[in-house]
Amino acid sequence: MGKFYYSNRRLACWAAGKNPHLGGSVEQWLAAINTDPSFRQTVKEDVQENREQPTAVRMFSWKVGSGPIDNPEKCDWHFVLTGERPAPSRPVKADEVVVVPQPKKVVIPTPPPPPAPYFRAVGAFAPTRSEFVRAIVERLTRLREESRAAALFAELPLEYPQGAPLKLSLAAKFAMLKHTTWRKWYDTSDERLLEAHPGGPCLPPPPPIQNPPSFQERVREFCRMKSCTKAFALETSLGLNKAWVGLVDIPSTSVCCADGKTTGGQTIAQEADPLQHRISTSVAPGRAQWISERRQALRRREQANSFEGLAAQTDMTFEQARNAYLGAADMIEQGLPLLPPLRSAYAPRGLWRGPSTRANYTLDFRLNGIPTGTNTLEILYNPVSEEEMEEYRDRGMSAVVIDALEIAINPFGMPGNPTDLTVVATYGHERDMTRAFIGSASTFLGNGLARAIFFPGLQYSQEEPRRESIIRLYVASTNATVDTDSVLAAISVGTLRQHVGSMHYRTVASTVHQAQVQGTTLRATMMGNTVVVSPEGSLVTGTPEARVEIGGGSSIRMVGPLQWESVEEPGQTFSIRSRSRSVRIDRNVDLPQLEAEPRLSSTVRGLAGRGVIYIPKDCQANRYLGTLNIRDMISDFKGVQYEKWITAGLVMPTFKIVIRLPANAFTGLTWVMSFDAYNRITSRITASADPVYTLSVPHWLIHHKLGTFSCEIDYGELCGHAMWFKSTTFESPRLHFTCLTGNNKELAADWQAVVELYAELEEATSFLGKPTLVFDPGVFNGKFQFLTCPPIFFDLTAVTALRSAGLTLGQVPMVGTTKVYNLNSTLVSCVLGMGGTVRGRVHICAPIFYSIVLWVVSEWNGTTMDWNELFKYPGVYVEEDGSFEVKIRSPYHRTPARLLAGQSQRDMSSLNFYAIAGPIAPSGETAQLPIVVQIDEIVRPDLSLPSFEDDYFVWVDFSEFTLDKEEIEIGSRFFDFTSNTCRVSMGENPFAAMIACHGLHSGVLDLKLQWSLNTEFGKSSGSVTITKLVGDKAMGLDGPSHVFAIQKLEGTTELLVGNFAGANPNTRFSLYSRWMAIKLDQAKSIKVLRVLCKPRPGFSFYGRTSFPV
């Protein structure tokens, strides 16, 4: 496939052709792509996914500018859709044009274009509303330009001294010259325009010459100016050097939802009441003196006014707002915003420049129906318009600070309505919701108006992409009972913001700063008994952990006459090790005036079951402690979740496991909690729990020194299917508890730990979820899950000890003669070998009075005890629990995935742990010091060729038949097979291992049967019959059948693996499904019958587990 060349026009044509049901012209799609980079990327990814289609090749394989659709006036859609070029209707010579030399003419330059109207495509294309919005924006833009010109040359305020000479600066004179030039271009009396534009320019008529205003007009203007005195005084008192202020109504079009619709299927009434935005014109240099005098007069007036006068002017004082934040009981409920006045919230930067701040409502929408449950409404919101950003960017501002965010909920309906409503505000450009959380406000609709304010201190760059997602609002309810088509609430969002320059701190009044430091203004309640939640603290303490890899290079050096060699310079690593770090701190804890809150009695939510694990006082390694059946824990507890489970039937929950145990750093105990969903290892660990069994399934390490332990088990991710409320034959989720490293000191008595199971059991919509694994020869990408090596023990001795962990990770672990297949070794076995950097963790599972210093390196073929050579290897010091990264050392840059017969782990690459200092312990201690190594991934893996390409795998061989009439039944279980009338030999390959270490599988298999004969080729007779069936022999259905002569020696067929539920479990004929029968009428004459299988793309596996055999 050739190279594709992309442009916005080509992507717009592709989107318009793919979505004819949405309507809209190519130019409208082009406008959406130009203004939304994320939408452009989505269209580009769609083209890349369909790059094999002929239409995509014809549209994007041409260089930009020479394609069939690049010219908007001559788009060859017939060629794009059919690939046919129209035949010429006459000879080509007839189309040739003879160019006659023409005398040179003077080219009149084209007039400067008028300002382009600002508009943005909103949501899906709706011609009526978009044209309405565009017309309004164009009209307002034209009015704004005319108002600017009028303010520069005509309309001076009445306060300006009449009759005084107008002193213009040099900049004003240049502006007048520019205006005169502009009028010259648009003057239709200019004869040059008739030559350049025959018929006259299509331009609006020139504005009429303005006469001096009459007395009536001046009186009318005086009354209009008096109505704007308060707004004008407020603007000028803040130091905004504006020459003219007006009030313009702009429709509320700032509500933007993903894909033009809400995520919860709700609708937003965008035809909200118009918002009042102040639009200020450019600076008028000619009136700088008048503005300065006006500002000084207003400041003297403000200083003369008393505190009560200021409160009467602003309708709210800062102390009243602060009491509202703290939820004072004596606060008078009134319909006022919680945002304090600007002069009280901010301190001015200087005499001539005030803070660039706006306090107004920038989002106002009505809620039609309340989303419930998981049907949450998401609203994308940008608090700062592009015009405002561009205006302050021209002034040198580089960032925007959102200091205050107010959420106001005005409900509609009956008083006392217990319908709850929650609005959550997050930072839209943060992927981690814990860090993005700004605050949430919850109220009951029957409590009336509810307001809340937050101080996020959110700062983002002026160069932020123009996306409507700076603030994300989520609206949800849990018990809405009203009609979905009724308007339930009006939600308004206000911001208090300022624009700051590079290396400038934001300016905040001392009272606001003090309140923010104390944490008192981080929570707010004013009306409706609003419950407000917001994060506390902002400073991150501790030392950040940094690791910067500085890559090496190569150079050429001379080693002899006309001889050079390439010298590789190794890379260096700059790192800072973090010893203590807190993501968030509570700034209230250091305040001396605040007292610690007492412990309160509480109950837990979501508790579904509980169990007890008994631990002996002398708990040794490999000790089996007990098993908890998850289904029995929930049913025996008989709580609310079990009742919900009975009602739902099928659930796919995320379990939270909490194991409450007292912390003790003197025992050195480490346990393993293994999640065995299909009851594969229960019978293997009841006597002695070998770590190979317990670590082959999903597991978690529990350290006694850390105390109470918790984790989450995503049943849908680990199993890929739903869970029935009663026991089934193919799954039985259990938690096995075993001891990995025993205690050094015997405790006083046996004890117990409590296991709590939390879950929200909601109904699942289907039985199958996302597959755990989809077959692909190149499925291994270097990442592991639940890869833990068995414990490594060091003796208390002065001799330097060495312990190794092999890196032949594709080798199947064994316990005696039993092979234990697991998913990690299966994935690695898909490749011949691998290289890269091993990233993992070391857990020192010893009592607190044990200590050791380890040197972790990678070595090839043996060990190095020469210290001078050893410490030249790249390695990592380990003194406590922590992570490490070590590059795999090998003369081939890779290590094999599996071993040959007679080889050991140390013959290849291995991770070696040298005890260069220690281990040490107090006198009387004789127990060994154990460590546990976990491998997380191979960073930047260097993978070899796949073990097998897209080819057939040997599944099973049948030989030594004892009967002539033989029938072999092939069900859903492909890993193992047994027979009493012939010898069975199973093939070992990655596909068979994948089936072994999963609970269910489904897909299509291509089968190939091959056989050899005992007798001479020409003297044999008989046939091989392959029949496809559904169900069982007694009540099932017969499908197609293939008969092959025994002398043909091979045959092919296919088999759909799956049952009525979608996927087959690893059991034989337990569910209504498809299967296949192979019948032989002269089986003794066949020496070997071999069955090969080849999975087709999309063959899926569900439920991670292991298989000891």
Curated annotation (Swiss-Prot):
The protein depicted here goes by the name: RNA2 polyprotein
* Gene3D superfamilies for this protein: 2.60.120.20
Sorted alphabetically, the Gene Ontology cellular component annotations on this record are: host cell cytoplasm; host cell nucleus; host cell plasmodesma; viral capsid
Indicate the principal place this protein occupies in or around the cell: host cell
The record describes its post-translational modification as: Specific enzymatic cleavages in vivo by the P1 encoded 3C-like protease yield mature proteins.
**GO BP term (any one):** transport of virus in host, cell to cell
Q: List the disulfide bonds.
A: none
The UniProt record lists the keyword Transport: yes
Similarity comment:
Belongs to the nepoviruses RNA2 polyprotein family.
Superkingdom of this protein's organism: Viruses
Miscellaneous comment text of the record: Virions are comprised of 60 copies of the coat protein.
Subcellular location field: Host cell junction, Host plasmodesma
GO terms (molecular function) for this protein are: structural molecule activity
Q: Which InterPro entries does this one have? A: Nepo_coat, Nepo_coat_C, Nepo_coat_N, Nepovirus_subgr_A_2A, Viral_coat
For this UniProt record, the keywords arranged alphabetically read as follows: Capsid protein, Host cell junction, Host cytoplasm, Host nucleus, Transport, Viral movement protein, Virion
Under Pfam families, the record lists: NeA_P2 (PF12312), Nepo_coat (PF03391), Nepo_coat_C (PF03688), Nepo_coat_N (PF03689)
| Lineage of origin | Viruses, Riboviria, Orthornavirae, Pisuviricota, Pisoniviricetes
